[in-house]
Amino acid sequence: MTSLSNSLSADAGRASLASAAGGEVSDFFALLKPRVMVLVIFTALVGMVVSDATVNPVIAAISLLMIAVGAGASGCLNMWWDADIDALMTRTAKRPIPDGRIRPDEALAFGIVLSVGSVLILGLASNWLAAGLLAFTIVFYAVIYSMWLKRATAQNIVIGGAAGALPPVVGQAAVTGHVGIESLVLFAIIFIWTPPHFWALALVKSGEYARAGIPMMPNVAGPDSTRRQIVWYSLLLAPLALVPVWLGFGGWLYAVVGVLGGLGMLAGAVQVYRLREGEPERKAAMGLFAFSILYLFLLFSALLAEQGLGLFRAVAA
């Protein structure tokens, strides 16, 4: 009986240890902001496929992985720096560092190792232009945005949005060795898309941002000014999103998605501008926030679909 008890205790101990190890791995993975990594992979891939070049699939796969790891590393460093304010916001209080599941020094070391590793491997596997752009993206997000802009100016999202807009540029550089007009246009689309996307959320979460001391636009310029700027950015985004059609790397499918999506963004922005009180305001803002994600996804998916269809036709011919 004693032997059986000891065996059961040992099994329980091993299970507990395995569970703890699994939890720690998932916590470190959470530091990488996996949902952001998925978006980075997606937009970087589009930057690759719109390039007028023969793409080596192995180099492309390694490059996408390293771009994703680099983005995750910058997210990890962002969480390390922002642990104090994350603890004050409901949306972020359960992140691994403020919740006490990972020590700040562990997160810092993890982020630095991944940053250096991703840049070096991308440089060796692809080229040093792409590696340099990835390094710039990491530094811009982790240092310039996280450590300076985020707590210093209401334009934090506008300027800092450059980091989130760079993956298509890095992706194109990785497979071609240069930066072309295609990826620069994609950069511009994401850059202009970012403010209305995040400010819609900021209108709803303004109280939390104020409590954390983050100068988001609704807390600095006021909700009315923020709503007007959301409309103006949406007006600018609609025609900008159609530039790929004018340049010839966006076809009819992309044009349809661009027109309908642009009108949808504008309609959502006007709705946010009109509804200014209570639950209707919150629903309008969160509706625009959600639609903006769908809009960008469909826009870039249309480019992927058209490039895939073009490749299929070329092979079939």
UniProtKB/Swiss-Prot annotation:
Protein's pathway: Porphyrin-containing compound metabolism; heme O biosynthesis; heme O from protoheme: step 1/1
A GO CC annotation given for this chain: plasma membrane
InterPro entries membership: Protohaem_IX_farnesylTrfase, UbiA_prenyltransferase, UbiA_prenylTrfase_CS, UbiA_sf
Subcellular localization(s) per the UniProt record: Cell inner membrane
EC number(s) stated in the UniProt entry for this protein: 2.5.1.141
EC class name: transferase
An MF annotation (GO) of this entry: protoheme IX farnesyltransferase activity
GO biological process: heme O biosynthetic process
Record flagged with keyword Lipoprotein: no
Membrane topology field: Multi-pass membrane protein
CDD domains hit by this protein: PT_UbiA_Cox10 (cd13957)
Presence of the UniProt keyword Transmembrane in the record: yes
Top-level taxonomic group: Bacteria
Protein keywords: Cell inner membrane, Cell membrane, Heme biosynthesis, Membrane, Transferase, Transmembrane, Transmembrane helix
Catalytic activity, reaction form: heme b + (2E,6E)-farnesyl diphosphate + H2O = Fe(II)-heme o + diphosphate
Record function comment: Converts heme B (protoheme IX) to heme O by substitution of the vinyl group on carbon 2 of heme B porphyrin ring with a hydroxyethyl farnesyl side group.
Family to which this protein belongs: Belongs to the UbiA prenyltransferase family. Protoheme IX farnesyltransferase subfamily.
Protein name, as recorded: Protoheme IX farnesyltransferase
Naturally occurring in which organism (per UniProt): Methylorubrum populi (strain ATCC BAA-705 / NCIMB 13946 / BJ001) (Methylobacterium populi)
